[in-house]
Amino acid sequence: REVYSVNVFAPLRLTQLVLPHFRPGARVVFVTSDASVEAYEGWGGYGSSKAALDQVAAVLAVEQPNLRIYAVDPGDMNTRMHQEAFPGEDISDRPPPEASVPGVREIISGHLPSGRYQARNLPVGADR
């Protein structure tokens, strides 16, 4: 229940509260995960909560066509959370969290249409 409160209900409620104050073209960015589309043993709650968040973003994009609604997957990273999720796996070859920053900046300042994106796969500056 807590994972859904944090990953689905809180972002949805916050968005509902600020939605009336947005101007056309405003952006809403949700942080998702590949666990929303890939099945990882033991990750049912987390993965399904991120899948629900992806759906929130998709429906909001249809309901609010004058806004840009994004679900952004920052990608696999060398973090404590990732290491704890995969104990015994060597994750030293994973990029640091900062590797996602250029893609996230593209979402925030570029001209991409609403949708779900993997931050590290975005061609930075390509849509300008």
Where are these regions (language model features)?
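Catalytic loop of short-chain dehydrogenase/reductase
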Residues: 1, 12, 27-65, 76
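Short-chain dehydrogenase/reductase
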Residues: 15, 57, 101-104
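A short helix-coil junction within the Rossmann-fold of NAD(P)-dependent oxidoreductases
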Residues: 17-26, 64
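C-terminal helical subdomain
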Residues: 67, 71-74, 79, 87-128
